[in-house]
C-alpha cells in the first residue's frame, strides 16, 4: 500500500487553474442535467396535475420549464469573471456568489445550497425505498391477488440504499462520474417512458379521459389551497438543477465557450424533460382522475403487467443511485476543499492510500473522504427514516430551493456581470420576474409545511 499526498499531483495534463484538462461535451452536460432533473420529482407530477386540474396543471409545468431555462441562461454567463468567455473560472456555485456578491450573501447562499442538496439526498433515499418496496408488493399482488394485504416496511430498503451510497460516495469527484450519469440518464428515460406508456394504455382501456378543469375536489376551500400549494412545490422540485449548474459547467472543455455549450445543454435537457413530465403527469391524471396516487409507479394504480412495474421501479433505483451522487458530490468537494485549506499539512486530510488488489483497478482511499462521506450518507438515511413522506418532502424541498438558488442569486449575479443599472428596463423586468417567483415559493412553502406537519401528526 502506497501513500500519495494530494498536494503532489500525479503525472497528467492540467489547465492553467491547476485542475485536470476538462473533457466534458454538450452530451455529457445533457446527461448530467437529465440525471439531476428527471428524478423522484417526475413520479409526483400526475398527483400535482390532479390537484391543479387540466388547465392550471400543464400551464404550471410550462411556466416552471421557462423559468428554469431563463435562470440557467443567466447563471451560465456567471461561470467566468469578469468576462463570460475568457475570465477566471468558478468551480462551485458558491464561488461565483462570492465573486459577484457580498460576503453575507455568500454565507447565505452556501448554507441554502448545501441544505438543498442535502435535502435531495433525503428525498432520494425515501423514493428509492418506496420503489424497492413496490417491487416486493407488485410480486405479492401478482401471486396473492389485488386484494391481498401486501404490507411491507421501508426501513430495510433505506438502509440497503444507504450502504450502496457509502460505497458510491468514494468516487473522488464529478469528473469521475460521467459513466454513472450516462447510466442514470438511460434509467430515467426508461421509467419515465414506462410511466407515460402505462398511463396512456389505461386511458385507452378506460375509453375516456378522467379529471376536471378544477382538479381534485376537497371538503373545504382551505384543504384545496393547501393541496394546490403543495402541488406547486412538487413541480418546483422537479426542476432542481440550477443549484449544480456551475459544477456541471466546470466539467466542459473549451472551445467552444462553456457558456454557449451550457445554454444549448440546458435548452435541450429542459425540452426533453418537459416532454416527459407532461406525458407522465397528464396521462397519469387522465388515467386515474381524482384517485391519482401520490407516486405514479408505486401507488398501485397499476398492477399489471407486474414485470413491467418491477422493471420501471428497478430503473428508478438505479437512476437514483447516480442522482444521489450528482447532488452529494458538490457538498463533498466544498467540505474537503475547506479542510485542505485549513489544515494543509494534515495527513488525515491530504494523504491518499493506494491499495492494489489483483484483478481489480487500483483503489485510492482518503481517510477524510471515507469518514465524512460515510457520516453524510448515514445522516441522510436516518432523516429519511424519520420523515418518510414522499409528496410533502418533495414539496418542501422544491419551495425552499426554487426562489433563492434558482432565481434570486442568478439574477443578482447577472446584474453585476452585465453591469445592469437599477431602474433600467432590464433591471425592472428581471426584478419583477424574481418577485413573482418569490410569491410562488412562499405559497408552495406554506402548503408543504402544513402537509408535512399534518402527516407527521396523523
Sequence positions of predicted segments:
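Hydrophobic alpha-helical transmembrane segments
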Residues: 48, 167-171, 383-388
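Alpha-helical transmembrane segments of multi-pass membrane proteins, especially transporters
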Residues: 32, 60-65, 265, 269
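Membrane-interfacial loop- and helix-cap regions that link adjacent transmembrane helices
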Residues: 3-4, 8-10, 21-22, 27, ...
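Short, hydrophobic transmembrane alpha-helix segments
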Residues: 45-53, 174-175, 391-392
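Central hydrophobic cores of alpha-helical transmembrane segments in multi-pass inner-membrane proteins
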Residues: 40, 65-77, 161-170, 407-410
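The first (N-terminal) embedded transmembrane alpha-helix
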Residues: 2, 26-43, 160-164, 234-244, ...
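Membrane-interface "cap" regions at the ends of multi-pass membrane proteins
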Residues: 1-44, 68-73
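Extracellular loop-to-transmembrane helix junctions
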Residues: 48-81, 86-87
Amino acid at each position: 500500500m502506497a501513500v500519495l499526498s494530494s498536494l503532489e499531483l500525479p503525472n497528467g495534463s492540467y489547465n492553467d487553474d491547476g485542475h485536470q484538462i476538462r473533457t466534458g461535451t454538450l452530451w455529457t452536460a445533457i446527461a448530467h442535467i437529465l440525471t439531476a432533473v428527471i428524478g423522484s420529482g417526475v413520479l409526483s407530477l400526475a398527483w400535482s396535475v390532479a390537484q391543479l386540474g387540466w388547465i392550471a396543471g400543464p400551464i404550471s409545468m410550462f411556466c416552471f420549464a421557462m423559468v428554469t431555462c431563463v435562470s440557467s441562461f443567466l447563471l451560465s454567463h456567471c461561470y467566468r469573471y469578469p468576462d463570460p468567455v475568457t475570465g477566471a473560472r468558478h468551480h462551485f456555485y458558491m464561488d461565483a456568489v462570492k465573486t459577484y456578491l457580498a460576503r453575507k450573501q455568500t454565507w447565505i447562499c452556501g448554507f441554502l445550497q448545501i441544505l438543498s442538496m442535502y435535502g435531495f439526498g433525503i428525498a432520494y433515499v425515501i423514493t428509492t425505498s418506496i420503489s424497492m418496496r413496490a417491487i416486493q408488493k407488485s410480486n405479492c399482488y401478482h401471486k396473492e391477488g389485488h386484494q391481498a394485504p401486501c404490507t411491507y416496511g421501508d426501513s430495510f430498503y433505506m438502509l440497503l440504499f444507504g450502504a450502496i451510497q457509502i460505497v458510491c460516495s468514494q468516487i473522488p469527484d464529478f469528473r469521475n462520474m460521467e459513466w454513472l450519469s450516462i447510466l442514470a440518464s438511460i434509467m430515467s428515460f426508461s421509467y419515465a417512458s414506462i410511466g407515460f406508456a402505462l398511463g396512456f394504455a389505461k386511458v385507452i382501456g378506460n375509453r375516456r379521459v378522467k379529471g376536471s378543469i378544477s382538479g381534485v375536489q376537497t371538503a373545504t376551500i382551505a384543504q384545496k389551497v393547501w393541496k394546490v400549494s403543495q402541488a406547486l412545490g412538487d413541480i418546483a422540485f422537479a426542476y432542481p438543477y440550477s443549484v449544480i449548474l456551475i459544477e456541471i459547467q466546470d466539467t466542459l472543455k473549451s472551445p467552444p465557450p462553456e457558456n454557449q455549450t451550457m445554454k444549448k445543454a440546458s435548452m435541450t435537457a429542459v425540452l426533453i424533460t418537459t416532454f416527459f413530465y407532461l406525458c407522465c403527469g397528464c396521462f397519469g391524471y387522465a388515467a386515474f382522475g381524482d384517485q391519482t396516487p401520490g407516486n405514479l409507479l408505486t401507488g398501485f394504480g397499476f398492477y399489471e403487467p407486474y414485470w413491467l412495474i418491477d422493471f420501471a421501479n428497478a430503473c428508478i433505483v438505479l437512476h437514483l443511485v447516480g442522482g444521489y451522487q450528482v447532488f452529494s458530490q458538490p457538498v463533498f468537494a466544498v467540505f474537503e476543499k475547506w479542510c485542505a485549506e485549513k489544515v494543509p499539512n494534515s495527513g488525515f486530510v491530504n494523504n491518499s492510500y493506494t491499495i492494489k488488489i489483483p484483478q481489480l483497478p487500483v483503489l485510492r482511499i482518503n481517510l477524510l473522504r471515507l469518514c465524512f462521506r460515510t457520516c453524510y450518507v448515514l445522516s441522510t438515511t436516518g432523516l429519511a427514516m424519520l420523515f418518510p413522506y414522499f409528496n410533502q418532502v418533495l414539496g418542501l424541498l422544491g419551495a425552499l430551493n426554487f426562489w433563492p438558488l434558482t432565481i434570486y442569486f442568478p439574477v443578482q449575479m447577472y446584474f453585476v456581470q452585465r453591469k445592469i443599472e437599477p431602474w433600467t428596463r432590464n433591471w425592472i423586468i428581471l426584478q419583477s420576474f424574481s418577485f413573482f417567483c418569490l410569491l410562488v415559493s412562499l405559497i408552495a412553502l406554506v402548503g408543504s409545511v402544513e402537509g408535512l406537519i399534518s402527516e407527521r401528526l396523523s
